[in-house]
């Protein structure tokens, strides 16, 4: 995403954290704007042409000649773009996502951020997408549903383009939608911080982790930071196993551990 500084100011000047965001997450490019968004609420929605008469005489001109020209500073015509990698990394740090960034081919303005890993051996892909319409968001989510075999997380700036069609697609895949403006805010560092606990944000996915009494395969909740020397496994009686990891322990059957079949 890129735009003239005039447009960034117009869109985000009402946000009290905008100066901090601008200075840390926008990057100057070598390009200059030839048009900017019209600030007049006339209903036409057409851009204004940027006309340079002199270095200090730059104006945004209404092409419909409905309104007077607006004086622009040279800096306001400079094109700034999002520091996408910095934003992606900040989101991952704030939300406890294992950062493994990749651009997704064929999906515009969409990135694989990494994985949400509630416990060792179980991970959920996390995708950030920035779309400008309901239709494009539907197409992105439909493509993700077809290409991703497991439940996943879709993160978008807001719920503005979230439609019933997207909600249905995600529900069919037991997947989750997260709106950044609802769950993150910009702190003073500057860094992104969560508005609620991560276990609450990702609760629908955490609930998919099988428990010890589920009768199926379970996932041992390995404490964060546990190293291999801190893990101990003891086979008991031919059908149960006890696991210690740091200060956590548990006793499970071979079936729960996915070891009942000789193939495992």
Specify the residue positions occupied by each region the protein language model found.
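Intrinsically disordered, low-complexity protein-interaction/activation regions
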Residues: 1-78, 164-167, 187-264
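Short linear interaction motifs
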Residues: 17-22, 97-114, 129-138
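Active-site metal-binding core of divalent-cation-utilizing nuclease and nuclease-like domains
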Residues: 77-121
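Short acidic, S/G/P-rich loop/turn micro-motifs used as interaction or catalytic elements
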Residues: 98, 117, 123-137, 146, ...
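Secondary-structure-rich domain cores
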Residues: 115-122, 141, 263-264
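Short, basic/hydrophobic alpha-helical segments
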Residues: 138-152
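Short beta-alpha junction loops
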Residues: 155-163, 182-185
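Acidic, Ser/Thr-rich peripheral helices and adjacent loops at domain boundaries
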Residues: 169-187
């Amino acid at each position: 995403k890129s735009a003239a500084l005039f447009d960034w100011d117009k869109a985000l000047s009402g946000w009290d954290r905008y100066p901090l965001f601008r200075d840390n997450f926008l990057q100057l490019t070598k390009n200059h704007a030839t048009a900017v968004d019209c600030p007049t609420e006339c209903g036409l929605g057409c851009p204004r042409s940027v006309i340079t008469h002199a270095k200090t005489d730059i104006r945004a001109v209404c092409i419909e000649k409905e309104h007077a020209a607006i004086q622009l500073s040279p800096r306001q015509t400079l094109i700034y773009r999002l520091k996408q990698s910095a934003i992606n990394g900040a989101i991952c740090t704030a939300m406890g996502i294992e950062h493994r960034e990749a651009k997704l081919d064929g999906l515009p303005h969409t990135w694989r951020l990494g994985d949400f890993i509630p416990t060792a051996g179980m991970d959920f892909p996390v995708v950030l997408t920035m779309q400008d319409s309901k239709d494009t968001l539907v197409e992105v989510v439909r493509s993700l549903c077809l290409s991703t075999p497991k439940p996943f997380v879709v993160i978008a700036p807001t719920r503005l383009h979230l439609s019933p069609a997207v909600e249905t697609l995600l529900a069919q895949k037991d997947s989750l939608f997260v709106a950044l403006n609802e769950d993150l805010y910009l702190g003073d560092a500057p860094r992104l911080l969560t508005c609620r606990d991560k276990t609450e944000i990702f609760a629908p996915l955490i609930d998919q982790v099988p428990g010890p009494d589920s009768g199926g395969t379970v996932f041992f909740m390995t404490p964060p930071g546990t190293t291999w020397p801190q893990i101990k496994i003891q086979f008991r009686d031919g059908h149960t196993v006890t696991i210690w990891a740091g200060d956590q322990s548990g006793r499970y059957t071979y079936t729960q551990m996915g070891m009942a079949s000789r193939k495992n």
